[in-house]
Amino acid sequence: MAARSAKYMYQSSRAGHGGDISIEYGTDLGALTRLEDKIRLLSEDLESERELRQRVEREKSDITVQLMNLTERLEETEGSSESVTEMNKKRDSELAKLRKLLEDVHMESEETAHHLRQKHQAAIQEMQDQLDQVQKAKNKSDKEKQKFQAEVFELLAQVETANKDKLVAQKTVEKLEYTVHELNIKIEEINRTVVEVTAHRQRLSQENSELIKEVHEYKISLDNANHLKGQIAQQLEDTRHRLEDEERKRSSLENHAHTLEVELESLKVQLEEESEARLELERQLTKANGDAASWKSKYEAELQAHVDEVEELRRKMAQKISEYGEQLEALLNKCSALEKQKARLQSEVEVLIMDLEKATAHAQALEKRVSQLEKINLDLKSKLEEVSMLLEQTQKDLRVKIADLQKLQHEYEKLRDQKEALARENKKLADDLAEAKSQLNDAHRRIHEQEIEIKRLENEREELAAAYKEAETLRKQEEAKNQRLTAELAQTRHDYEKRLAQKEEEIEALRKQYQIEIEQLNMRLAEAEAKLKTEVARLKKKYQAQITELELSLDAANKANIDLQKTIKKQALQITGLQAHYDEVHRQLQQAVDQLGVTQRRCQALTAELEEMRVNLEQALRAKRAAEQMHEEAVVRVNELTTINVNLASAKSKLETEFSALQNDYDEVHKELRISDERVQKLTIEVKSTKDLLESETERVTKLETIKKSLETEVRNLQIRIEEVEANALAGGKRVIAKLESRIRDVEIEVEEERRRHAETEKMLRKKDHRVKELLLQNEEDHKQIQLLQEMSDKLNEKVKVYKRQMQEQEGMSQQNLTRVRRFQRELEAAEDRADQAESNLSFIRAKHRSWVTTSQVPGGTRQVFVTEQESSNF
């Protein structure tokens, strides 16, 4: 007998884990007990590995359930309910196929187990055929080794693909971080623009305060002008009282002249009868002395300029008493002198009549002006009615638009209810799917063989990769949408800038036109003033020359009358010229009134724009509420989908869309701020134009006051001349005085009309002041609205920061989920490797019942199993 031992060695290396498996087996008849112990240990290891595998499968099934729920939710948000039902049907069919496959695999596994048992029994019975079987097993082990190596290479390729996917995901994350950084930079730029807008607003408020101060100064100047106007009216009343006093003086002088004529007739009778006339003359002298004393006592204060003439009369009367002969000659000389004075007074009265005719012509012109102003007033009333009709129409349109908005809101609420109903149905379907998946997981737990499990894991990996790719495609689609929205935003911004440039050009053209018109008006006023001054100087010179000629040409009265008529015609022509200049000035005033009407229409347009701004503000508030609702929904979704990577991608895309919507809202707010600033600038320009108009009107008022003062000086000169004429007037002046009185009444009526017109102008000025106050109030309201918009922008910035923080938190959660998934994958791979090793060891051990098994554990994680088989033979 000699003992023969055969030793076989099997080595296998796993590149993924760095562990080597070496199997040495031989035949030993005395090692069965130890082999059974090792088999027991290996079976226990197998059971522990199976338990670990089942636990991993449970966790994996939970993760798959969560993945399916998330994919269903994504499909609910992106697609419609029909697509979801089709996908569910497809998944049900796939689940049925998988169940059939699992049942087939289970049957096959049972059959293989039974077959292995039979083989084990046959191996125990037939010990001699073990060598051939060992050789066959060796060949099989070589084949299995090749298979394992191929599987290892496949697993390495999968690891490389996973690493590539990881790099791609990291690149996408870096891109997203770069986009977030760019968005932060944009937000900082927007904050800077908001700060600039606030500074511009403060500057506008300062300018507004300065304009208010200027308006206050203008009010003070208007009050001073009104005070001067009252003083001028008082002066006119004083002149009227003086005229009445002069009329009374004139009537007294006429009575005195009549008495003098009676005395002349009595003196002629005395010449014929000297003796009788002496007594009568003495009586008349006594009467005349008494009358003269009475007249002297009455009119000493009133006729200081005519005291010399009264004294001459007294001396002449004394000479009559002393020397009758000399008195007759003196009386004749006096009569001739009185006739000359009468002729001179008549010429002066004719001059006064001409002046009064001029005054009547001026009164007629003023009446025409009044009629024109009434026509203008009627036109303005008609325009005001038209504007009121337009305002009512716009209000009706506004109401219609508000009703349409309410309808749209109602439809939006209906759609939201439908969306909620669809979400409920999708949740029900998700629950059904979860139940089906739980059943599928129960079926999976029955599977014991590792190869089928590896295939299933590979399929699940492919599904995860497909889901990851789908998420990547969705992210790319969202990025394309974002780029398209940014392009549209840039296009709209460019369009708005073009419109603003066109409006600014139109405003500049209008400003230039108004400046040209104002310069033309100033030139015309200057020309009219120069012409008036030259004509007044020429008239003064002519009047002085005529007065000298009249004084020198007492003998040629008829020629002087003819010359006076000629001069009267010339003066009438000059008056017509002055009236034409006055009409031009009035036309310019009318143009100024039209410009005021234009400014009022602009103010109405500005009020309409303010109403539009309010409507836009309401829309912005509604958008803000909608954004808050969307934010709440997003928060709910984020709380639901914090543990899953796919949900992170969907939530991230939603947050990006919401951020773009908020960015659009912020751009709209910025545009509204810019539009409000432009409107404030327009208001300041219009206030400046009204200020210039007020200055021009005040200048015109001052010019009119100077003209009025010159006319008052002329009236005073005329009054002095009238006093001289009345002092030297004789019989025949009553009718002239009556005419003068009627003319003076007409002049008084004209003065009253002028007062009334002045009162109307004051009313217009008050209305303008009221309008300026309204504009200031509107400006303050605009500032308040700007402040509200700024507060809204601050709130939006805060929301953006919250969204950023939530995105960062979700990214952290996604990274945690990725690490967990990778850890589970590593554990699964390790468990699969251990199961493969255990199964291979069992197969070899069951094939060889006479074997001696030794195991050793390397600290690096490798496990070595030594099987030694010995065979004895007798020679």
UniProtKB/Swiss-Prot annotation:
Alphabetically ordered keywords of this record: Allergen, Coiled coil, Cytoplasm, Motor protein, Muscle protein, Myosin, Thick filament
Gene Ontology annotations for the cellular component aspect, listed alphabetically: myofibril; myosin complex; myosin filament
Pfam family, one: Myosin_tail_1
Presence of keyword Cytoplasm: yes
Residue numbers spanned by region Nonhelical region: 1-28, 855-874
Database matches in Gene3D superfamilies: 1.20.5.340, 1.20.5.370
Spans annotated as Disordered: 110-143
Protein location: Cytoplasm, Myofibril
Tree of life domain: Eukaryota
Matching InterPro entries: Myosin_tail (IPR002928), XRCC4-like_C (IPR014751)
Major subcellular site: cytoplasm
Coiled coil: 29-854
Similarity-based family: Belongs to the paramyosin family.
Stored PANTHER family: CINGULIN-LIKE PROTEIN 1-RELATED, MYOSIN-6-LIKE
Assembly notes: Homodimer.
Role of this protein: Paramyosin is a major structural component of many thick filaments isolated from invertebrate muscles.
Protein name stated in the entry: Paramyosin
UniProt organism field: Blomia tropicalis (Mite)
